[in-house]
C-alpha cells in the first residue's frame, strides 16, 4: 500500500515506520464508513450507557435518516464533557481526528461517517453553555430539564422545548453575531406568536421585562429592522443585569472568555498543514483536488493553498500543460529574489495566526522545497543558503506526502529537462522529506484512486494520532 513512511524519531530504519503505518491503515480499511443513521443510533446507545441525555439543539427534523447540516449541535453540561468523550470513544470504527474547545463549546471531528457527498467525517459540537462573552442568556440546566423526548426508531433522543429552541435559534446569531439567521426565522416567529408570554418569561430573568417584550414583539411583527435594532439594548441589558447581580462572577466570566478566545485563535494547532510534494505538478493538483472533497468536515475549514498564491512567483511560469521551458524565465535579481523569499516567509506565519477563527486543515499542493530543489524554475537568483535558512523557519507541516514519479513518466512530462536533471530533482525531493519530517512516500505510477486513498488514510492516521495525544492530556 504505502511505499515508505517516516516519523520524528531517534530510530533510523524506515521499515519500522512502514509497518506501523500499514497496521493503522489496514485498521482503517477494515472499518467501513457509517451512514448517518447508523452512526446516530450508535451515538444514542453510547450516551445511554454513560447515563447522558442526547439533546439535539437544531436541524433534527430529518433525524435519524439524514442530517441536513454538516455538523450536529448537542447540549450538555460542562461537567458531562468527559463522559460525552467516552461515549464517542466507545463507538466502534469511529476515530477522533480533531478537537477544539472554547469556554462555551467543544468540537469533535470524527472520521468514518458519510456526512456529505464524498466526505467521510462529521463535526459534533457540544454546547457547554448558552452565553454571550461568558454571560448566560439562558440556563442550559433548565433547557435540559425541559427537553422533550423524540423517537428515533427504537431509540429516543431529546430536543429543547419549542420556547427554548426558538430563543436559542434566535439569540445564537442575533446576540452573538448581530445578525438574523433567516433559516430559523419563520419557526421562531411562529413559536413567539403562539407562546408570547412564555417566551417573555423565559427571557426576562437575563434581559429584563422591557427589553424582552420589545424583542418578542419585533419578531412577531416580522420587522427585521426593529429586530436588528434590539441588538445593542439586548447586550447592554444582559451585561448590566449580570454585573449587578453577581459582579465578581461576571467579571471573572468575561475575563476567562476573552483569555480563552485569545489562546484559541493564536494557537499553532488551529491550522494544520499537509504538504504534497513531487516533481509532477499535474499529479499533485489532481491529488489535492480529490483530497479536498473527501476531507470535508475533517475540520471546520478544509482548504487548498498553492505556492503561487503565496509567493507571487506563479506569474513567471508558463501554463502547466505547456511545453515551454520554465527554466527560460528571467531571473528576479539578487535583492528581488531574497525579498520574495522573505515576503513569503512572513505571509506563511501571518496566515498561521491571522484569519483562522476555527480549526483549519490546509492541503498545500506545492511548497518551498520546490524553490530549493529547482530555483531556476522560479527565477531565484539569491544565495541558496538564505533560501535554505528561510525554509527552516517556515511553520511545520503535520505531514509530507511525496508523490515519487517513475523516471520514465517524469521524463515524458518534462521534455525540457534531461534525464540527469529529472533524476537529481527526484532525489532532491526524497532527501528533503526524509530530513526529520513526518512523511509518506507514494508511488505516483499507481492508479490515481489508489494514490488518493493512500494519501487520505495517511492524513487521517496523522490527525488521529495528534488528536489522541491532545485528548489524553485534556481528559
Model-identified regions with their sequence ranges:
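Glycine-rich phosphate-binding P-loop
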Residues: 274-291
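NTP-dependent small-molecule kinase module
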Residues: 229-232, 236-247, 411-475
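ATP-dependent small-molecule kinase phosphotransfer cores
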Residues: 307-380, 384
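A glycine- and Lys/Arg-enriched "phosphate-lid" helix/loop adjacent to the NTP-binding pocket
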Residues: 366-432, 438
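Post-Walker A helix-loop "phosphate-sensing" segment adjacent to the P-loop in P-loop NTPases
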Residues: 293-304
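Conserved NTP-donor binding/palm subdomain of two-metal-ion nucleotidyltransferases/polymerases, i.e.
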Residues: 22-72, 76-272
